[in-house]
Curated annotation (Swiss-Prot):
It comes from Shewanella baltica (strain OS195). GO terms for cellular component: cytoplasm; plasma membrane. It is found in: Cell membrane. Pfam families: DHO_dh (PF01180). This is Dihydroorotate dehydrogenase (quinone). The gene is pyrD.
Length: 339
């Protein structure tokens, strides 16, 4: 009930202003009696992924809490994990405003944020300051002004700094809003990046006597051959997980709607089927060797079950969470428990 009222107010506001207000409000109310306004108790439905045991299979996807400011509030809502970021080595403002658009009739969102964040050092402070023991994944990327050829250096810097504070690390090479970033998904650039990240992971594991899994987040706009090549690279470099998928550049199902022609990545309900299709294709290529976290257009428990059926071991929500509220977490967990 509270969420429906809050949503009605926020949907009258500019989307990015509403986002900042939401994160700020959650930060202020976390670990206080006011969590009763959005908190809920969800019975455990444990799932093992990447050598970790999560209390339930529903996580918050990266992009909602980029700087890790409201982790404890999302824990109160019942998320099994929170993925913060995308974070870059240095703070950056992201792309010009406006850069976030609702497509309400389609339950979709278009964003061209451009990895706006306060930098990895700020994120680490917030990870240290959190009071709950929720599993936190850290999604890492490269700064906009770092040449693609040197992109791997940015990922290694972020890995070094977040390693001790992350349950797992997600490598984002699939955002459409950083020029040239998606080129890292192909050929030699992909293999060089994954190899460098794996080497760094093993060095850090030896140094800290702690193994932190790494997962690769991929785009939905890939051919079957490209998915096969990514799967082979993941297996070759012994990655621990794959996250499928990021936002899409396609506009299927939204043509004619207000804001549909805005540039950027499309998420939400219009992405549902494409994301599930990519998960299924990726699962066939990985043959059970590497687990998949399914994300993209989950707007209901049925959407989540389709991701599990396609081959995902765990799921994440973001746009669906904005449109449906915290009740979506409980609905998915309950459906998973009955599955």
């Amino acid at each position: 009930m509270f969420y429906k009222i809050a949503q009605k107010v926020m949907f009258q506001m500019d989307p990015e202003r509403a986002h900042h207000l939401a994160i700020g409000s959650l930060k202020m109310t976390a670990n206080s009696p006011l969590t009763c306004l959005y908190g809920q108790t969800i019975a455990p439905a444990p799932v093992s992924v990447m050598g970790l045991t999560f209390p339930n299979p529903v996580g918050l996807a990266a992009g909602m809490d980029k700087d890790g400011e409201s982790i404890d509030a999302f824990h109160a809502m019942g998320f099994g994990h929170v993925e913060v970021g995308t974070v870059t080595p240095r703070p950056q403002p992201g792309n010009d405003l406006p850069r976030l658009f609702r497509l309400k009739p389609a339950k979709g969102i278009i964003n061209r944020m451009g990895f706006n964040n306060k930098g990895v050092d700020n994120l680490v402070k917030n990870l240290i300051a959190k009071k709950t023991d929720i599993m936190v994944g850290v999604n890492i990327g490269k700064n906009k002004d770092t040449p693609v050829e040197q992109g791997k250096d940015d990922y290694l810097i972020c890995m070094d700094k977040v390693y001790l504070h992350a349950a797992y690390i997600a490598v984002n090479i699939s955002s459409p809003n950083t020029p040239g970033l998606r080129s890292l998904q192909y050929g030699d650039l992909l293999d060089e990046l994954l190899s460098a990240i794996k080497t760094k992971q093993l060095e850090l594991a030896e140094k800290h006597k702690k193994y932190v899994p790494i997962a690769l987040k991929i785009a939905p706009d890939l051919t079957i051959e490209e998915i096969e090549n990514i799967a082979q690279a993941l297996i070759k470099n012994k990655f621990d997980g794959a996250i499928a998928t990021n936002t899409t550049l396609t506009r299927d199902g939204v043509s004619g709607l207000a804001n549909a022609n805005e540039s950027g990545g499309l998420s939400g309900k219009p992405l549902t089927e494409l994301s599930t299709k990519v998960i299924k294709q990726l699962a066939m290529c990985l043959k059970g060797q590497i687990p998949i976290i399914g994300v993209g257009g989950i707007n209901s428990a049925e959407d989540a079950l389709a991701k599990f059926d396609a081959g995902a071991t765990m799921v994440q929500i973001y746009s669906g969470f904005i449109y449906q509220g915290p009740k979506l977490i409980k609905e998915i967990v309950n459906a998973y428990r009955l599955k």
